[in-house]
């Protein structure tokens, strides 16, 4: 049995790398640091950092902190978080991912221009909470690209000029499926010549803010992180190339769920684990009881490479022949 570790399309993305590096640096300097929410959606990595002095706090505990040092994670935060930090004299280490920061700015400016904000994303995801905060928590948030959940559409006003954006870790095909269905729905309400949606760039928004450009009433901006989405095809191919795939990610990881689904579609013998102890020997054997020839180990953008290496080493020591 050969164990193949994916080093090209697994492991921390740049945004998470920056957050972890900043946390380690602050912990080394000060010996302690608060993180507002899980620093990354990976319990194994959270435990490692907590052993170094990181303390994770929820919203209630965050509001009660005074004169402390707090880290803002890569997911970003709404304006209200920074207001509380100022009021409570908190020192903030802001590690919001640059891609997320640009998305927050886009959302804020479009809202100021009078657009109804539609977010393709998960309502409870920290990144979406931060984005929604840029538009006074008035965004219409849609998780199901096929519009199969009517509750998600209750706040949608077809009479308003609207802009569609996305949580950075959602899937590209889903975004464009949602865009097409929204176009059709708005077309039923508006005249056909007014229902065309225009793709916009940051420069277009800036021009509109200064009055140089007049934008149409229906817009969309594909804000999905390409560093994340580019992994999709690579993981698909990696899964096809191995008899069995062990996908390693935190159970809370949104990106992990998306990438695991891609692996599972490519190779039905793909298995999701968070901890090494979850691996079952029967996964690694064929129906005749013989060991499979190849096992691939891969993971999400929130999975540390050290943990992937640990899983691969465990497989080599205990199952490889």
From Swiss-Prot:
It is an enzyme of class 1 (oxidoreductase). Catalyzes the conversion of 1-hydroxy-2-methyl-2-(E)-butenyl 4-diphosphate (HMBPP) into a mixture of isopentenyl diphosphate (IPP) and dimethylallyl diphosphate (DMAPP). Acts in the terminal step of the DOXP/MEP pathway for isoprenoid precursor biosynthesis. One of its GO terms (biological process) is terpenoid biosynthetic process. The keyword Transferase does not apply. Binds 1 [4Fe-4S] cluster per subunit. Isopentenyl diphosphate binds at residues 41, 75, 125, 253-255, 302. Belongs to the IspH family. It catalyses: isopentenyl diphosphate + 2 oxidized [2Fe-2S]-[ferredoxin] + H2O = (2E)-4-hydroxy-3-methylbut-2-enyl diphosphate + 2 reduced [2Fe-2S]-[ferredoxin] + 2 H(+); dimethylallyl diphosphate + 2 oxidized [2Fe-2S]-[ferredoxin] + H2O = (2E)-4-hydroxy-3-methylbut-2-enyl diphosphate + 2 reduced [2Fe-2S]-[ferredoxin] + 2 H(+). Its cofactor is [4Fe-4S] cluster. PANTHER family: 4-HYDROXY-3-METHYLBUT-2-ENYL DIPHOSPHATE REDUCTASE. Dimethylallyl diphosphate binds at residues 41, 75, 125, 253-255, 302. (2E)-4-hydroxy-3-methylbut-2-enyl diphosphate binds at residues 41, 75, 125, 168, 253-255, 302. Pathway: Isoprenoid biosynthesis; dimethylallyl diphosphate biosynthesis; dimethylallyl diphosphate from (2E)-4-hydroxy-3-methylbutenyl diphosphate: step 1/1; Isoprenoid biosynthesis; isopentenyl diphosphate biosynthesis via DXP pathway; isopentenyl diphosphate from 1-deoxy-D-xylulose 5-phosphate: step 6/6. [4Fe-4S] cluster binds at residues 13, 97, 225. Its EC number is 1.17.7.4. The active site is at 127 (proton donor). This is 4-hydroxy-3-methylbut-2-enyl diphosphate reductase. GO terms for molecular function: 4 iron, 4 sulfur cluster binding; 4-hydroxy-3-methylbut-2-enyl diphosphate reductase activity; metal ion binding. Keywords: 4Fe-4S, Iron, Iron-sulfur, Isoprene biosynthesis, Metal-binding, Oxidoreductase. It comes from the Bacteria.
